[in-house]
Amino acid sequence: MPSILLHTGQMTLTLRQKAQAILREAGWEIPPPPVIWSPRMARCAGFFVVEKDARGKWHPEIRLSIPLLRRRDWPWPQQVCGMNCHDPEAVQRRILEHELIHYKLWMDREKNWGHSERFRQLAWEVFGHQSITHGIGSEPD
């Protein structure tokens, strides 16, 4: 499968490299999960999922919505995670930050890696998110 690239300034990064950079900036010493574009996700902008393979091993993955995150006709600025985003790249970054918080909590073996109080604390303290929901599309609780 070909790599999907994000343009950030003068460098072009894959989504996984972008996730790795966000994790490093947050000070989280964990490897990035696979991050994929999903053409079928039409209601939720991003989703963190953990699936079990045939051998019983759990695998985390972040899925991002092609229909929602590759739109170019949003009115700007767009509120994402309670923050004003002025371009599609900023929207993608906020969504990726949000999903990486779920991943971090899962990696830390938290019992609840959903929208818990710990999630809210990390969202605010690490990324400055004003809301624990994306604000684009709808999200499961």
PLM regions and their residue ranges:
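Active-site-proximal or metal-binding-adjacent scaffold patches in catalytic folds
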Residues: 1-94, 103-141
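Walker B catalytic acidic pair
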Residues: 99
